[in-house]
Amino acid sequence: MVNEYFTLHNYGGTLEYYLFELANFSALAFFVVFLYKLNYINSNSLLAWLAIFFTPLIINYFIISPYLFGDQFQYAREAMSLKATGGSIETVESRFGTGNTVTYTAKILGVVPLPNYMTVTSLAFANKFFIFVTFLWLKRFFSNENELLLYFLIPSLILYSSMSLRDTLIIVLSLVFIINLIRDRYVLAAVFLYPLLVLKIQMFAFLFLYFIARLFFRAHKNYYLFTFFVLGLIIGGFIMQEQILAVLNLYRIAFAAENFVAFDGSISYHAWNEYGGGLAEALELSSLGDALFKAILNLPNFFIMPLPWNWSNIFYPLQALESWLLIYLYVRLGMKQNLYKNYEFILLTFILLIGSSIYALLMSNEGTFVRYRFTLFYPFLLGAFYLSSTSHKFLKK
């Protein structure tokens, strides 16, 4: 078979690169125009999504170097290998084993029927497809299509979905999980939760806690059940304190090691193994009280970073402004029709704060955790938007 002789060719920013990706753009453009002709979407959505579908062509190589997000090449190569040979790349399989995040991401993104998967940007168009399908699914819950569309024009969503990364899959799965959980579709919610166990274990943990709180504790019903859940969480935390601290300390040290720079210029884990051993003890959390105290101290920084004194390019102030606006939007949704008094919204926000607090504890590299913050925050923002909808049953109580 010809696929036995598959080798990866990096087309870079050549003419062939743009021809391949224009074909992928054209396929998605045809799909959105077809839906417009069927009157399934309005003219604003047509124009917006055509622009959104075009962004991968102007992000990689044109605006920023794809090597700034080097993971793209790993996912793209794995997808190409799976399609060409039916097997994983040797380095991926030997390094991560079977059923790893890279292979799993490549398999899911690879199911999108695009004309080709020839370059590092091809998977970005698969991400765009999943985002668009999510928009179509959500649209039926809202009377105002244009208002929903605005949430899909958030710059970070456009940016991260314009690259061959797993962030978009995590956002889509988390968002669909949250909406189905709010709608009491527990089995369907569990189906969308399961892939996160491989794609993003931290996100799985946060949302699984939400699942338990709602299904077993019924914490979204009233003050007493919510309080019972919080007390249960505190008691369970102290019972499993050693195990929880072991996991938190492992991740704190791992993130610190990943971003470590030694005095001789060496970086990451190799440098940490040589020079960073003495810093590990300072990073370790001694108790859950210590963890809570440090999380509270770091939480404001986590929500508003990157901070002005760390701005090194034009994207940093834009990301900071976006983070402030998204927080404002979430608060405004909470104030809408006194939603902040509703225990469905209170539970949703409580889980968001738990996830944010844990990330604030683990935070090391700002660039990495700006991505993590958006991946966590955006699904909860859409969940709040769904709850604030005037047609939602919770607002009628």
Which residue stretches match the model-derived regions?
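Transmembrane alpha-helix segments characteristic
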Residues: 2, 49, 341-361
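Transmembrane-helix motifs of polytopic, lipid-linked glycan transferases
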Residues: 29-35, 122-143, 328-333
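Transmembrane-helix signature of polytopic, membrane-embedded enzymes
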Residues: 41-45, 135-156
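Extracytoplasmic loop-helix module adjacent to an early transmembrane segment
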Residues: 41-91
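Short hydrophobic/aromatic helix or loop-helix immediately within or flanking a transmembrane segment
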Residues: 71-117, 297-298, 302-303
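Membrane-interface transmembrane helices that cradle and orient dolichyl/undecaprenyl
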Residues: 138-145, 176-188
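Short acidic/glycine- and proline-prone juxtamembrane loop motifs at membrane-interface regions
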Residues: 162-168
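Alpha-helical transmembrane segments and terminal signal-anchor/GPI-anchor hydrophobic tails
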Residues: 205-335
